[in-house]
């Protein structure tokens, strides 16, 4: 029983998104009922009409399901906005892990958009997949932030979102002109990355393509150029664009941007939490015989491969994340919850950071709100965070869901497609 529990929970549940899995299960029913895999054996002339009818019926049933989920989300939003209602929404009962929604989600329209691109209703052997639903949710979210309100802030993860894992944002990257287009539309940009560098030169080496393009742009106003910040170490180091700086980024003193809640974090608690994490990581290196070395920073501690050529197995990284996270949660300083932390799998390494991306995105919201004055407050419904790690454990974009809308991508190519979709929707709204 213990072994089965460990397999089912520790190795599988943390790699799933309950909301997406629930939608996937709902869509499996019409797929089973209306797909026609035997059509490949029928007479071609007959099968064309049959498949067309089947596709239309599957599309209709899928659309109905997304319309019903859309209504459930509306009901969930009504419940979360009613502080006096003690009862959970129907969606909360069906998907207990569901969190807050900052906007409505036009899921039916988003499904029809993605169905035209991915031909989901035409498939006979492959049911609507996790990735299909993830992209439908992305489309619904960017439809919402451009239709029901105004996008004021877009924040991005670094690795796997803006550039490939371990690489840099090169001048030839197709992401760059799309980010510049957002700046021209007066959308603020925050790059919220786990990379915990304390100096501007290290961030310049990762982001030089974008920073140089901004510095050399003739059609960006000084105000628009000031609309980019880099938040490093999840929520620990803030840099703003500065064309006069040698590395085009200027560090912002911590006392200028810390939120009142972050300013209350005790340095002794931070040191104690990192000490516990360090001991747990050392134990993992020994127990799992990891080819890794420990790295301690002022606001983070982690393990990295002993040489760049070595890749630690994914399962070992996940085991390390889950073990360290559990040890921290059960520790005295962890139980006190005085200092938030994030244990995450970086793909090649594992780190524990003080704070998490919900704090990083919050700092970006407040930083730009302060610059805009009392009428420029950036709320969750006006914020879009784009990242690749949204699973419930070992994923550092997950907690950004608590402070703004999100889009879950799987590669820089998907980021480009998302930004193109966003630009088209923003263009329609302005026209």
UniProtKB/Swiss-Prot annotation:
The UniProt record lists the keyword Magnesium: yes
InterPro entries, per database record: HAD-like_sf, ISN1
GO biological process: inosine salvage; nicotinamide riboside biosynthetic process; nicotinic acid riboside biosynthetic process; nucleotide metabolic process
The protein's role, per its UniProt record: IMP-specific 5'-nucleotidase involved in IMP (inositol monophosphate) degradation.
Organism: Neurospora crassa (strain ATCC 24698 / 74-OR23-1A / CBS 708.71 / DSM 1257 / FGSC 987)
Binding site for ATP: 117
Residues that bind IMP: 157, 159, 165, 193, 349, 357
Active site residues of this protein: 157, 159
Cofactor(s) recorded in Swiss-Prot or TrEMBL: Mg(2+)
Subunit details: Homotetramer.
Name of the protein this chain belongs to: IMP-specific 5'-nucleotidase 1
Keywords: ATP-binding, Hydrolase, Magnesium, Metal-binding, Nucleotide metabolism, Nucleotide-binding
Molecular functions (GO terms): ATP binding; IMP 5'-nucleotidase activity; magnesium ion binding
The keyword Nucleotide-binding belongs to this UniProt entry's keyword annotation: yes
EC numbers on record: 3.1.3.99
Annotated control of activity: Allosterically activated by ATP. ATP binding is a prerequisite to magnesium and substrate binding. ATP binds to 2 of the subunits in the homotetramer inducing a closure of these 2 subunits and the release of the C-terminal loop, thereby activating the enzyme.
One Pfam family in the UniProt entry: ISN1
Binding-site residues, Mg(2+): 157, 159, 388
Reaction(s) the record says it catalyses: IMP + H2O = inosine + phosphate
Family the entry assigns: Belongs to the ISN1 family.
